[in-house]
Amino acid sequence: MANSLRGEVLNLYKNLLYLGRDYPKGADYFKRRLKNVFLKNKDVKDPEKIKELIERGKFVMKELEALYFLRKYRAMKQRYYSDTNKTK
């Protein structure tokens, strides 16, 4: 069981690192923060607590994906739709 959790944690770290490439404050900032969070929890041994932390990490992944999707949507909307409420 410990090996499966370890693999899951490593996979989560790898996926978060990949998603952090486009983080608004920069990839270096994201990588540093991610590493600090994982190092802070490296001594957790309780499988239930580890599962809880993994779920929190998955939630963060979903939030990042939503952030990127929204940013792309806003950029496309700005390019293709003019704001009719603007006054000149």
Curated annotation (Swiss-Prot):
Q: Where are the annotated coiled coils located?
A: none
Gene Ontology biological process terms in this record = negative regulation of oxidative phosphorylation; respiratory electron transport chain
Q: What is its main location?
A: mitochondrion
Q: Record keywords: Mitochondrion included?
A: yes
Instruction: Extract one GO cellular component term from the record.
Output: mitochondrion
Q: How does it assemble?
A: homotetramer. Interacts with NDUFAB1. Interacts with ETFA. Interacts with ETFB.
Give the UniProt family note.
Answer: Belongs to the complex I LYR family.
Q: What does this protein do?
A: Acts as a regulator of the electron transfer flavoprotein by promoting the removal of flavin from the ETF holoenzyme (composed of ETFA and ETFB).
Q: What is this protein called?
A: Electron transfer flavoprotein regulatory factor 1
Species of the source? Bos taurus (Bovine)
The upper taxonomy is: Eukaryota, Metazoa, Chordata, Craniata, Vertebrata
